[in-house]
Structures are given as C-alpha cells and as structure tokens.
C-alpha cells in the first residue's frame, strides 16, 4: 500500500529502524521492521516465504565461500541478528519492492502513534517490550508488538518526527 507520492532520492534519510512483530492470525506472527524516515515510515514485513528465500541466498553465499559448518552456522545467525541494519541504507521504493505486504505511511496520514514500553524482572533476567500502535487518519490501526525498552533517544526521535501525535508511555 502506498499512501504518498514518490519523492526524489535526496529526501531519504533513515532516522531509526525498529524491530516488531505483527499478528496475522491467532497463532501466526511475522517480523516487521518499522523504518523511520524523515517524512514517512515504511513497514518491511518478513514473511516466511521471504525469510526462506533470504536464508537460501545467504546459504548459497556461505557454501560458495567454502566456509565450514560451524562458521557457516554462526554466519547465518549473525546475518539474521543484524538483518535490520540493511534498511538503514535503503530507499522507500527499494523496501516496498521487496514484499507485496510492505507499505509506506507519510507522517501526515498518522493521527496517533502509541509507543508503550515496559521492563520486567531483575538485573539478572529482565525482559522488555511493549506495543506500537499506528492509528491512521482513515480509521485503520496497525498493531505491532516490540522488544525495545524505554529509551530517551528513541522517545526524542519519535517526538521529533511525530510531535503531538506521539503518545509515549513507559
């Protein structure tokens, strides 16, 4: 879904990439990266088919380099743990072209973005996460779950992009 008109490549600038989970059905969740640009956000969905294709591509790369099993396994884990970083250098059209589910939303189409963060547990075993709900001016709401903890820098980034439309709760 494309809610905006194309812009020149010079206006692109990724502010931050957030990792989230999107619930498709009762037992089906997929990873979704929220790529925050200066003028819009882009949702990049990692569907099972897309993940399988990316894993196959990386496996072929690892095999072609002659890397052994253990180093290859470590390389594959590293690939997926830093996968979100690739979006820091991609343009919105390139992200949208990856998967038909991907969508871009200009900030002026967002009536409210609710970011709720929590931290549980003690020093040794704490967990963090929360909700990221994007309410659109057409009445639709995109509901995501995230694993980010409260961060003043994140709050500041979201505040600078969304202003009064941001509801940040910890």
Please provide the spans of the model-predicted regions.
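Acidic, Ser/Thr- and proline-rich intrinsically disordered linker/docking segments
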Residues: 2-14, 23-32, 36-170
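Divalent-cation-coordinating short motifs within acidic/hydroxyl- or histidine-rich contexts, strongest
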Residues: 17-18
